[in-house]
Amino acid sequence: MILSLLFIATVFAAINAVPYPACAADTLQWTAVNIPVEGSTGGLWKLANGSDIRYLTMANDGTLYCYANPAGTTHTLFKSTDGGRSWTTPGKVTDVIIDIAALPQDGATIYYATASRVYKSEDGGNTFVTLPPSPGGAGSGNVSISSIDVVRVGDGNTVAVSTIDTDAAQFGGVYLLEDRPLMGTWVNTAIGNYDVYRVAFSPNYNVDRQIIAIASNEVDTFAISKIYNGCWGQNPANACIGGIMPSAANIAFPNSYNYLSGAASFFLGIDTGVNKGDVYTISSTIIPTAYTATDLHIGSAYGINAVDIAGLAISGSTILAGCADSAGVYLSNDGCISWTQCTRAPTGQSGTCILTVPDFNTQHKAYAVTRGQESAFSYSNDGGLTWNQVRTIDFLLVQ
């Protein structure tokens, strides 16, 4: 014990004998650092306080578009040409956007929809023209546009919009417009008594002339198809998901989708707003010619019976599903046999919209946008397992 005390005393004496360097206060100085500020710098956005980010869309040249509503500007359409690292506001659009569609055959042509109108740009969003207004009476009588899609057909484009009517026992529909130099008017495709939450052209529309709609009769949800000039639900017959009414829906087509093969499947993500949704496989059979819906129960491994879905993306055997009521992402790498939650989610609180890059199977890169506090544009380079925020971050730094 005495030897230990002597050793400690010797050590302290040695330490005290060593002269201290000059006081830090005498030699060091604090320097102000310019932290990022809200809004744009040189036209490029970094922080976007108060912003919700939605409808992330990729043109065929890789250009990204989205809707956002930051407090620092009235502009709402954002564009990135560098994978989301920087964003500009082309066209100075100030509308409340409800959907964005890029023409698959032309990277410079995009469309966006409001609740009652559709707008078109052929120069990457720098200028827009207005298409004929109010398809199906949208903008009056509680009727509003719910989604938009577009495809090149011949020497022009065909535009499809879906509408809903929030009045009880009143319904929306699907309307087509031939966007050509001699433009006509919106044509009612007569889908019947349904509110339609999503409309999409088949990836092979120029061959199979198939349009798919996700609709509700205010009780159940239906996947409905129309081929050429035939009637809706005629071939194949509708798939019904009983007891579920959507507030929004998403469709994702596999790379190999081919309706004419007679056994084509696509994926449906349903957001009910009350957490009763999920991801479904919609499959067509040859005999009888009908759709069937299979609930994939993506949360079952975690004891979760249903998951509302805000975004859906597919590449090869990998499927990514973004949650509607959180920023979470579920992924399957084996064609929907098993599902895993991401280990680090995109920042934000809800409304996770997802895109995969065209060469996802090589790069394993995907993008996501979210809503709520700390919503942001995020990316993943490991197939959706972990996510990192990049830009348009909903955060206010106070100096």
Please report, for each region that a protein language model flagged, where it lies by residue.
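Extracellular glycan-interacting surfaces
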Residues: 3-399
